[in-house]
Amino acid sequence: MSAKTDEILDSLKSLSLLEASELVKQIEEAFGVSAAASAGVVMAAPGAAAGGDGADAAEEKTEFEVVLESFEASSKIKVLKEVRNATGLGLGEAKALVEAAPKTIKEGATKEDAEALKKAIEAVGGKVTLK
């Protein structure tokens, strides 16, 4: 990397969470982009690539889709926290995702990660399927 990009990276590493959030908002406004939309596109890409190998995927699946099917109303906040932890989404995006169940919450996950996420969400009252 160049000295300039190294310097920028070092500056970003020193930002507090609040400063990083403000920076994201400023970048979204300045460039007319949305961080949430690009995260969704990035998350969708591995799943799309896995779907292209129909014959290989039938033999042994290596990437999984974690789908939140439903949740107990009394456990909504706990499920929301688990979804946020797994996806890195903000509160608003995670809330919209949970309320839109059934909805894919993670794509391209390894078998171990998918099963761990399923177990964590089911432990707090959610119903999850792996595809």
From Swiss-Prot:
GO terms for biological process: translation. Keywords: Ribonucleoprotein, Ribosomal protein. Signal peptide: none annotated. The keyword Ribonucleoprotein applies. GO terms for molecular function: mRNA binding; structural constituent of ribosome. GO terms for cellular component: cytosolic large ribosomal subunit. It comes from the Bacteria. InterPro entries: Ribosomal_bL12, Ribosomal_bL12_C, Ribosomal_bL12_C/ClpS-like, Ribosomal_bL12_oligo, Ribosomal_bL12_oligo_N_sf. The keyword ATP-binding does not apply. Forms part of the ribosomal stalk which helps the ribosome interact with GTP-bound translation factors. Is thus essential for accurate translation. Homodimer. Part of the ribosomal stalk of the 50S ribosomal subunit. Forms a multimeric L10(L12)X complex, where L10 forms an elongated spine to which 2 to 4 L12 dimers bind in a sequential fashion. Binds GTP-bound translation factors. Belongs to the bacterial ribosomal protein bL12 family. This is Large ribosomal subunit protein bL12. The lineage of its organism: Bacteria, Bacillati, Cyanobacteriota, Cyanophyceae, Synechococcales.
